[in-house]
């Protein structure tokens, strides 16, 4: 794998920044040439806990603290994908497009209401990025290594990275949207959160009889998730057909095994 060091400003990185409220993820930066959350990346987490972490990113920039290195993968067609730094870049992009406020002198300020010197400070802050080029296996292995720090990748997030493709993309769209109205119902029976892939992991566990990795490997290039979705819904509907009420003790039971 080959790497080259590149310097960008926050303004350059955030040019053309696009954020999907539906999928809770940053889509593009660098005027559309940078894919911020490719298939193998985890969901955006810094907006959780009232946005504590994304505010901390802006605070670091204002205080001129280093944000750390970024790593981009250069694909065969010359486009860039974020390998490491997705949470930081999305936080910067969300702030620079007015998605949240930063407290300055006890006053909430969005980017357009900051004093001009502070706004320029943010826009002109330099970010160091390594551009990586290599085979898919090299890129995926490097992704796992550089993501050891920070918010630890859980086993399902790692499998999503290893077996990224149309199947994982469709499965994440179905089971990993924390704003989906069905999440509350699922959460009565499943422990964890949609954002950290816990519901997807459980759905895969149920349909594969616990052989999640084998199932993901077999279906990696499938363009639909009908079997996965239908089996999950069958289990949920079965639970609801048996119990008239939802009890706290029902959360986290091995429903897939009980159904089978």
Predicted regions mapped to residue ranges:
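N-terminal leader or domain-start segments enriched in small/polar residues
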Residues: 1-80, 91, 97-100, 127-128
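Hydrophobic transmembrane signal anchors and adjacent membrane-proximal interface regions, especially
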Residues: 5-7, 109-111, 188
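Alpha-helix initiation and N-capping motif
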Residues: 7-10, 33, 54-55, 89, ...
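Polar low-complexity intrinsically disordered regions enriched in Ser/Thr and small residues
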Residues: 19, 29-35, 101, 109, ...
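Short, polar/flexible loop-turn hinges at active-site or ligand-entry regions and domain interfaces
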Residues: 42-47, 99-104, 150-158
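A short, basic-hydrophobic beta/loop patch
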Residues: 64-81, 86-138, 159
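Solvent-exposed functional surfaces
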Residues: 72, 97, 118-260
């Amino acid at each position: 794998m080959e790497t080259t060091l590149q310097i960008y400003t926050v303004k350059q990185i955030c040019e053309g920044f696009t954020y999907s409220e539906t999928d809770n993820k940053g889509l593009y930066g660098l005027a559309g040439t940078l894919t911020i959350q490719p298939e193998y990346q985890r969901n955006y987490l810094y907006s959780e806990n009232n946005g504590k972490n994304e505010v901390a990113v802006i605070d670091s920039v204002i205080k001129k603290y280093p944000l750390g290195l970024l790593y981009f993968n250069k694909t065969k067609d010359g486009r860039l994908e974020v390998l490491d730094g997705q949470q930081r870049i999305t936080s910067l992009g969300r702030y620079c497009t007015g998605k949240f406020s930063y407290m300055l002198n006890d006053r909430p300020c969005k980017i357009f209401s900051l004093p001009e010197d502070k706004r320029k400070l943010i826009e002109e802050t330099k970010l160091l990025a390594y551009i990586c080029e290599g085979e898919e296996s090299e890129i995926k292995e490097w992704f796992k290594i550089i993501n050891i720090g920070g918010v630890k990748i859980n086993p399902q997030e790692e499998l999503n990275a290893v077996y990224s493709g149309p199947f994982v993309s469709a499965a994440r769209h179905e089971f990993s949207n924390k704003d989906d109205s069905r999440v509350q119902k699922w959460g009565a029976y499943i422990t964890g959160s949609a954002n950290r892939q816990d519901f997807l992991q459980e759905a895969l566990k149920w349909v594969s009889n616990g052989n999640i990795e084998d199932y993901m490997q077999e279906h990696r290039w499938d363009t639909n998730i009908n079997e996965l979705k239908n089996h999950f819904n069958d289990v949920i509907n079965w639970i609801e057909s048996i119990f008239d009420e939802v009890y706290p003790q029902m959360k986290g039971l091995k429903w897939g095994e009980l159904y089978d």
